[in-house]
UniProtKB/Swiss-Prot annotation:
Has a putative N-terminal zinc-finger, a middle region with homology to RecA with ATPase motifs including the RadA KNRFG motif, while the C-terminus is homologous to Lon protease. SMART domains: AAA. PROSITE patterns: RECA_2. GO terms for molecular function: ATP binding; ATP hydrolysis activity; ATP-dependent DNA damage sensor activity; damaged DNA binding; zinc ion binding. Gene3D superfamilies: 3.30.230.10, P-loop containing nucleotide triphosphate hydrolases. A motif (RadA KNRFG motif) lies at residues 250-254. It comes from Rickettsia felis (strain ATCC VR-1525 / URRWXCal2) (Rickettsia azadi). Belongs to the RecA family. RadA subfamily. The keyword RNA-binding does not apply. DNA-dependent ATPase involved in processing of recombination intermediates, plays a role in repairing DNA breaks. Stimulates the branch migration of RecA-mediated strand transfer reactions, allowing the 3' invading strand to extend heteroduplex DNA faster. Binds ssDNA in the presence of ADP but not other nucleotides, has ATPase activity that is stimulated by ssDNA and various branched DNA structures, but inhibited by SSB. Does not have RecA's homology-searching function. This is DNA repair protein RadA. Transmembrane segments: none annotated. GO terms for cellular component: cytosol.
Length: 446
């Protein structure tokens, strides 16, 4: 008879300790220690078997990549799904994870690949009703409602010759009989994910795991979950906005930082093949406090609108708020504007927003942000049909930007005829206005 053991585990890094503490001694995160009851029926095996070595220069098995019918998903994955790979998709509740996975498993992809959709959150009838709403009933995709790990693996094993792709929605609902802890705990997620990923790799099956996120946007469960899989994707978006962005944060078979853009509608997720044009649709010219940033997301050029609002404040410490951009970087740009060109906004509230619910981490967006702030502060719009890109240093100088030619081509394709950026080498166009300092930018917006 086994005896249940109690221990405390960090939900961030998975480190265990015999006593509770307010801070994890391994990763240093506060408030991440939770109590778990662990019961195991496995006997400890101390013997092993000899394994054969291989040479680094030996034969490499071909990694067969299978394109999906969803082009934006192919872009993020690096061209398609790789046999034997494990993919983790995280996102807020209701953002569209299950919709995307069901559209993949029940599309014409199912006519080429044998797909199994396993749900632990819905009944089979609920899945069928959602498939009817999304018009996905023409394809004979297998579905299974199960939450027990051993039952799932046994079901796949019995039909493994007829299964190429398995979708698990979601990993937080799966439990193993080896543990007495409830579903969604760190130990359950770690063991279940590890068993599923190992089984998929041993049998050359593609597995897609849907994952919940915490209130601060992190994947729920131990960090080791992200290390177990080959690819980590985040589904981003605002429930008040119909745009969704699928972004890769880890990819062993492709690039990191690639994005796919979708539009959520009544019939499911629709691909947005030209997001720049969609995000700038019906935009008015000569609007004070707005500018267009020519950005790069992964390998994709993307034009985004930057909006700024400046109002007088009676507070001792005026508010600075940024949506879709780093608030600390906004404070830095405001300090540089005050120090280098005398634009003092100490007694004003400053609000910055990226239109369309997008998030920008590209440092080349500094120049577009500065242009919006100068426009909002002076009451004068930026030049018509202009785009901005360039990183601002603490001295007020505009630094060179990577992939400048790609940004320029995207802007010209969408009808912009004035490019305001840092000085470029080997690129001489009449419509490029090079700026080397914030003083030059201030002269343009006047």
């Amino acid at each position: 008879m086994t005896k249940d053991k109690k221990h405390y585990i960090c939900s961030n890094c998975g480190n265990t300790s015999p006593k509770w503490s307010g801070q994890c001694f391994d990763c240093g995160v506060w408030g991440s220690i939770v109590e778990e009851i662990v019961s195991t029926n496995k006997a400890i095996v101390k013997t092993g078997s000899k394994q054969d070595f291989d040479k680094l220069s030996g034969h490499v098995a071909e990694q067969l990549r299978i394109p999906t019918p969803i082009g934006e998903l192919n872009r993020v994955l690096g061209g398609g799904l790789v046999l034997g790979s494990a993919i983790l998709i995280g996102g807020d509740p209701g953002i569209g994870k299950s919709t995307l996975l069901l559209q993949l498993a029940a599309s014409n992809f199912a006519s080429k690949m044998n797909c199994l959709y396993i749900t632990g959150e819905e009944s089979l009838d609920q899945i069928k009703l959602r498939a009817i709403r999304l018009n996905l009933t023409n394809y004979n995709t297998d579905i299974l409602a199960a939450t027990n790990l051993e039952d799932i693996i046994a079901s796949i094993e019995a039909n493994k010759n007829n299964i190429d792709l398995v979708v698990i929605d979601s990993i937080q609902t799966i439990t193993t009989k080896e543990l007495s802890s409830p579903p969604g705990t760190v130990s359950q997620i770690r063991i279940c994910a590890n068993e599923l990923v190992n089984y998929a790799k041993q049998n050359n099956i593609i597995i897609l795991l849907s994952c919940h996120v915490t209130k601060d946007g992190q994947l729920a469960g131990p960090k080791i979950l992200e290390h177990l899989v080959d690819t980590v994707l985040y589904f981003e978006g605002d429930h008040n906005n119909h745009f969704r962005i699928l972004r890769s944060y880890k990819n062993r078979f492709g690039g990191v930082g690639e994005i796919g853009v979708f539009e959520m509608c009544g019939s499911g997720l629709i691909e947005v093949t030209n997001p720049s044009e969609l995000f700038l649709m019906k935009r008015e010219q000569n609007v004070i406090g707005t500018s267009i940033f020519a950005g790069i997301e992964g390998s994709r050029p993307l034009l985004m609108e930057v909006q700024a609002l400046i109002v007088p404040s009676n507070m001792v410490t005026p508010r600075r708020s940024a949506v879709g951009w780093d608030a600390n970087r906004l404070s830095m740009i405001l300090a540089v504007l005050s120090s280098r060109i005398g634009l003092n906004l100490a007694n004003y509230e400053v609000y910055l927003s990226i239109a369309g619910g997008l998030k920008i981490a590209d440092p080349a967006s500094d120049l577009a942000v500065a242009a919006s702030l100068i426009s909002a502060a002076t009451g004068k719009p930026v030049p018509e049909h202009s785009v901005f890109f360039g990183e601002i240093s603490l001295s007020g100088e505009i630094r060179k930007t990577a992939k400048a030619e790609t940004r320029i081509k995207e802007a010209v394709k969408l009808g912009f005829n004035k490019i305001i950026c840092s000085k470029l080498e080997n690129l001489t166009y009449d419509f490029i206005s090079s700026v080397s300092h914030l003083k030059d930018l201030k002269e343009i917006i006047r």
